[in-house]
Amino acid sequence: MSAKFNFEIAVIGIDIGKNSFHIVGLDRRGAIVLRQRWSRGQVETRLANLPPCLIGMEACVGAHHLSRKLTSLGHDARLMPAKYVRPYSRGQKNDFRDAEAIAEAVQRPTMKFVATKSAEQLDLPRPPSSVSFA
């Protein structure tokens, strides 16, 4: 099933959850034109059907993989530290408001972004276990 959108999305904010992603899309004027919850499997397929746009996410381990994938689809995916997104939140905290704050923050010219890491960079060596299985 392919998702077709009848409006032009310029910026997307994604709040990454364990099982679902909250998506808020803004048009060029900054008006909200998309507010949906997608499952993990729907994110890549639905975003593949959109023309390239600016996509913001809070930096976490899962965001690096998604950022690499979205960049390969032609989108401009950017990661931000959560502490820099927080000032853009309005009202009571919920996942859609977090996604909206991410969409607002990613557009700011003074925003500090986190570089997307490769899978090798994220694969940190583990300390040796003190438990012996002999």
Regions found by a protein language model. Name each.
Residues 1-133:
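Phosphate- and other anionic-substrate recognition elements at nucleic-acid/protein interfaces
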